[in-house]
């Protein structure tokens, strides 16, 4: 989003620095696997095509979370992309508007009434992309809308997807317009127990560094979603950045430097 790109080049920098520290120290270290994915934004597209059978590791750490160093994200939501297309009927807007069916008006009925925003404490829905028409003197005959839903409960996410499709079709019924809906279930939620091997390892790491650790649920997806789905117990680790996805993104330099040390200690404290 910004030239800084702390989300998530701060994580890349921390990994490279941690490995550099290990190599420079000359101390023996266990076998490690490092995966740099492309296209993490949006919808974890890169890791969607990764061959996870290449990995031997059973524990993992995704350096891709906002917040001060010491923050561990042990849960992230399931997410689905939502799409619909409303097809109306074009007509001259000045000579014969009554002969047309305005797809934009029909679409507005959906967006004005559908349940969206904060659905419950662990679920959200958002509609953010809309394209329609190309001239003001033509009754709009096509609208394309894109949105998403996410929830820390996979079943709630699936339930909203069903609600979305039914609501759209029910709303369009009787208007003369037609609608097509599509749902793409992008990635599955995960929750790692606070007494798991990954979090216990991080307790040891942060204790050695004199940093207070917090364990929290995250609101966004990350490659840890895919790793957990494929049998690698993985948590997210903060690297000191904030206000990501905005032009005001920044990173605490001290946290960034400490993140390299954190990676070094993760490697040295890992027990196969």
Each predicted region: which residue ranges?
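A short glycine/serine-rich beta->alpha loop
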Residues: 1-6, 90-96, 133, 246, ...
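Metal-dependent amide/peptide-bond hydrolase catalytic core
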Residues: 103-272
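Short glycine-aspartate micro-motif
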Residues: 58-62, 83, 234-236
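Alpha-helical metal-binding/catalytic segments enriched in His/Glu/Asp
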Residues: 1-41, 80-86, 95-116, 147, ...
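A short glycine-threonine-serine/GTX helix/turn-capping micro-motif
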Residues: 71-73, 91-98, 134, 189
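Solvent-exposed residues in well-ordered beta-strands and their adjoining turns
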Residues: 37, 64, 85-89, 150-152, ...
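Acidic-glycine-rich active-site phosphate/pyrophosphate-binding loop
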Residues: 72-85, 204, 235
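Acidic/histidine-rich catalytic neighborhood of metal-dependent amide-processing enzymes
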Residues: 2-77, 125-127, 136-137, 145-148, ...
């Amino acid at each position: 989003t910004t030239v800084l790109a702390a989300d998530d080049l701060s994580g890349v920098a921390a990994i490279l620095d941690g490995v550099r520290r290990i190599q420079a120290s000359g101390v023996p270290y266990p076998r490690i696997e490092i995966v740099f994915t492309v296209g993490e934004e949006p919808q974890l597209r890169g890791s969607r095509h990764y061959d996870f059978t290449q990995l031997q590791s059973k524990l993992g750490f995704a350096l891709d979370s906002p917040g001060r160093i010491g923050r561990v994200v042990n849960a992230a939501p399931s997410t689905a992309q939502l799409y619909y297309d409303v097809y109306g009927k074009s007509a001259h807007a000045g000579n014969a508007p009554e002969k047309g069916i305005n797809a934009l008006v029909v679409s507005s009925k959906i967006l004005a009434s559908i349940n969206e925003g904060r659905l419950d404490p662990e679920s959200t829905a958002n509609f953010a992309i809309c394209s329609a028409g190309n001239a003001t003197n033509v009754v709009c005959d096509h609208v394309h809308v894109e949105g998403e839903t996410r929830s820390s409960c996979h079943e709630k996410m699936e339930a909203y997807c069903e609600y979305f499709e039914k609501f759209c079709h029910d709303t369009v019924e009787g208007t003369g317009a037609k609608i097509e809906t599509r749902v793409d279930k992008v990635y599955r939620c995960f929750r790692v127990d606070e007494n798991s091997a990954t979090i216990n390892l991080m307790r040891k790491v942060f204790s050695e560094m004199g940093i207070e650790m917090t364990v929290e649920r995250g609101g966004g997806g990350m490659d840890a979603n895919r790793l957990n789905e494929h049998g690698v117990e993985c948590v997210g680790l903060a690297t000191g950045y904030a206000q990501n996805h905005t032009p005001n993104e920044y990173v605490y330099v001290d946290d960034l430097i400490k993140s390299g040390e954190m990676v070094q200690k993760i490697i040295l404290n890992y027990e196969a």
